[in-house]
């Protein structure tokens, strides 16, 4: 991972930032996919599998959130970081994944109550 204390000034550093942003997209997308897979398992009544998938989803989301935190710390609200479309896209992925996980957690709990 790149040193986020030094925001990119060169093409190589910009490419490194793009790699970090892609890592954010990949992890947040993985978190969302695992959450939806967990919901599918819950609908089928396999709550142990659903819990395991939600745990994996949480870990992927934690990885994505860590990357986001480092990006924010690197900028420190000073506007050092150039905002690109891919960075906005990454933030969108993260936020929708967080929301999906929260809602899917509630849906799984409802399925458990209905099956009880």
Features from the language model and the residues they span:
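Terminal alpha-helical segments
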Residues: 2-116
């Amino acid at each position: 991972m790149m040193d986020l204390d030094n925001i990119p000034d060169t093409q190589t550093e910009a490419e490194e930032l793009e790699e970090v942003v892609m890592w954010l997209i990949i992890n947040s997308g993985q978190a969302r996919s695992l959450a939806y897979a967990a919901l599918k398992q819950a609908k089928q009544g396999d709550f142990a599998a659903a819990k395991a998938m939600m745990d994996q989803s949480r870990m992927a989301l934690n990885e994505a959130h860590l990357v986001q935190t480092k990006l924010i710390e690197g900028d420190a609200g000073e506007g050092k970081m150039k905002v690109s479309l891919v960075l906005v896209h990454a933030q969108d992925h993260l936020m929708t994944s967080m929301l999906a996980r929260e809602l899917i957690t509630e849906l799984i709990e409802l399925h458990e109550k209905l099956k009880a």
